[in-house]
Amino acid sequence: MDLLVMLLSLLVSYLIFKIWKRIDSKRDQNCYILDYQCHKPSDDRMVNTQFSGDIILRNKHLRLNEYKFLLKAIVSSGIGEQTYAPRLFFEGREQRPTLQDGLSEMEEFYIDTIEKVLKRNKISPSEIDILVVNVSMLNSTPSLSARIINHYKMREDIKVFNLTAMGCSASVISIDIVKNIFKTYKNKLALVVTSESLSPNWYSGNNRSMILANCLFRSGGCAVLLTNKRSLSRRAMFKLRCLVRTHHGARDDSFNACVQKEDELGHIGVHLDKTLPKAATRAFIDNLKVITPKILPVTELLRFMLCLLLKKLRSSPSKGSTNVTQAAPKAGVKAGINFKTGIDHFCIHTGGKAVIDAIGYSLDLNEYDLEPARMTLHRFGNTSASSLWYVLGYMEAKKRLKRGDRVFMISFGAGFKCNSCVWEVVRDLNVGEAVGNVWNHCINQYPPKSILNPFFEKYGWIHEEEDPDTFKMPEGFM
C-alpha cells in the first residue's frame, strides 16, 4: 500500500513538474519592447513649401499637367511643412545619386538612433544577441546589417537578418522574426533597425503612376530594443500579445499593385497601380479575419455573430414572395465589430491621408483615434516601415498610454502584404521618462488648429484650367 502511495506521489509530482516547466518556458518566450528611438534629422534637411516647389521644377521631363498633378497630390497628402529629405536634394543632385549618398543617409540615421537607445538603457553593443535590419530600397555589399556590426564591433555569434524589398510593412515582419527567435533562445536582447533610403530612389520621369511616390515619402527611421529576459520585464514598455501576417503575392493584381520598374524612358521608379486600394482592402480584411478572434472579448464576437444572424434573417424573403426588396433589412441593427472593446489605441501606418481615412472608416474610429496617425503624417510624412513608431511616440508624448492598454499596429506593404500586431502597455508611460521621444520638442503644438497645406494658398492656380500652350508660371513660383 505504501509503495502504491509512493508511486502515485511520484507520478503526481512528475506531472506537476512538467506543467510548471511548460508554463515557465512560456514565460521566457515573451517578447518585450524595452525602448525605442525615432530619428529626427537635422533642421538643415527640413522640407518646406518653397523647397518642394523648387524640387518639382528641377524635373525637366514634367509637362504642365504633370506639374499640376504633382502639386495637387502634395496639397491633399496631409503632409506639413516640417518633414525631412536626404542631403543630396538640397545639393540639387536628386537625379544623379551615388551609392555613397544612400549609405551616408543610412549611417546618419542608425548612428543617431542606436547610440541613443543603447546609452539610455546602459546596454553595450556587445550585449546584443539578435540584429534585424529592414531597409527596402537599398541593397549594398556588405549589407547594412554588416556595416552596423562593423561600426559597433558586435559579437561574432550575433544572429543577423537583413531584410530588403519588404515595403512599408517591414517593421512588423522584423518583430515577427524576433518573436520566433525568442521562442527558442532564452535571455536574449534584440535590436530592430528600420528605415528607408530615399537618396537613390528619386523618380525623374513623368509617369503619373510613378511620380506619386516622390510626394509621399520622407526621411526617418527607428531603432527598437527588445528582450525576452524575465529580469528586464519590469523595465519594459510593451509586451507583444499577438501578431498576424497576410501575404497576397499569389494574386497577380495584388502582386502588381506596387512594383519597382522602369518607365518608357528607362527611368526607375515605384509604380502604384489603380488596383492598389482594392489589393490593400482585400489584404486588410483577410488579416482582420485572423487577428480579430485573438484580440476581442468573446462577448463582442457573440454580439457580432448575433447581429449578422438577425441581419440575414431580416434580409431573407418571406415565403411566397418573389420580390427580394420587400425583405430589405431594417435600420437599427449594427453588424460591425466594435474593436474598442479589446483595443485602446490604433497605431496606423501613415501611407497617406486616404489610407488613414479608409482604416478609420473600416474600423469605425473617431478623430481622437486617428489623431496620432494624422499628426505623424503632418509632422514627419510617410517614413515607410518606421512610421508606426512615430505614431506610437505621439501617443506616448501625449501621455495616452496607461498600464494595461492595448495598442493595435496596422501596416501595409508591397507584395501585397498586410501585417498587424497588438502590444500591451506594461507600465504607465509618461513623457517625463522618455527623454528621447522624437515628439518632445513640438508636442505642445499638436494637434494644430489647421493642417491645411500651405500649397493650397501659394499654388491655388493648380485647380484652374489652363492652356498648356499659353500658360506661364505665376510670379513668385520660381
Curated annotation (Swiss-Prot):
Pfam families attached to this UniProt entry: ACP_syn_III_C, FAE1_CUT1_RppA
Signal peptide: 1-25
Induction section of the entry: Repressed by herbicides such as flufenacet and benfuresate. Down-regulated by darkness and low temperature, and up-regulated by salt, drought and osmotic stress.
GO cellular component terms listed in the entry, alphabetical order: endoplasmic reticulum; membrane
Primary localization class, coarse: endoplasmic reticulum
E.C. no: 2.3.1.199
Reaction(s) catalysed (UniProt annotation): a very-long-chain acyl-CoA + malonyl-CoA + H(+) = a very-long-chain 3-oxoacyl-CoA + CO2 + CoA
Keyword Transcription appears in the UniProt entry: no
Subcellular location: Endoplasmic reticulum
GO terms of biological process kind: fatty acid biosynthetic process; response to cold; response to light stimulus
One Gene Ontology term of the molecular function aspect: fatty acid elongase activity
Keyword line: Acyltransferase, Endoplasmic reticulum, Signal, Transferase
Tissues where the protein occurs: Expressed in siliques, leaves, stems and seedlings.
Keyword Acyltransferase set for record: yes
Pathway(s) of this molecule: Lipid metabolism; fatty acid biosynthesis
Domain FAE: 26-313
Active site: 168, 247, 345, 349, 378, 382
Family that this chain belongs to: Belongs to the thiolase-like superfamily. Chalcone/stilbene synthases family.
The protein, known as: 3-ketoacyl-CoA synthase 3
Organism: Arabidopsis thaliana (Mouse-ear cress)
Primary gene name: KCS3
